[in-house]
Amino acid sequence: FNSMAASLSKVETQRSEFTANVSHELKTPMTTISGFAEGILDGTIPPERERDSLEIIVSETRRLSRLVRRMLDLSRLNALTENITAQEQFDLTETVSQVLVSLEGKITGRDLDVDVKMPDEPLKVWGDPDSVTQVCYNLLDNAAKFAAKGTTITVQITKKDGKAYTSIRNLGATIPPDELSLLFDRFHKADYSRSMDREGVGLGLYIVKTILGNLKENITVTSEDGVTNFTFTLTLA
């Protein structure tokens, strides 16, 4: 009974923290949007600055949309059982290729190259295809976001001991050692990333970790001399 009570208390604490974090994250863009909109309407913002103000409103609206989308992703994760039982076989190389295509605009927009090292033939793994697609998207989006402009993102898939290892490597700022263990915490944003990523809300890597945990898989990260590498596992079919 005491164990159950402690577990329920922990869940309630996490729920309260989640609600507080959501309220804070939503309030920031809404306050900005409201402030600039009211400034335009009441004349506080002069006509010559209205366009700049509208651009800020549009930017914050998009950020709010991204935030809501992340919250929905998180809500979907919270609804998952601890073990995902409805796993199926799918081609990991095809999944990675499709995600790269969807991020092509962002990658080329930052003048990045992509070096893909994957088997030519289909590589079948076990998992939930939609969830693994989300994992690949979040990691590749993260790499594109923090890679130094004009550098190369390396995507490599290898096989060993019944597992497929997918590594995503980018060149950029080194993540401090004391931050590495916190990267996968919900709503955590490393100090080094705050100035580089004003749009993120600290959920992307948490979602990755949660999905892989539900699949009973693993993810590791290293960051040395400007090279950051994320590697996650999936079970070969």
Question: Language-model segments: which ranges?
Answer:
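Conserved micro-motifs of the catalytic ATP-binding
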Residues: 79-85, 124-127
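Conserved glycine-rich
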Residues: 216-217
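Short alpha-helical segment of the dimerization/phosphotransfer core of two-component systems
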Residues: 59-65
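Conserved catalytic submotifs in the C-terminal HATPase_c
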Residues: 88-89, 108, 113-123
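Amphipathic coiled-coil signaling helices used for dimeric signal transmission
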Residues: 1-14
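A conserved beta-strand-to-alpha-helix junction within the catalytic ATP-binding
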Residues: 86-104, 115
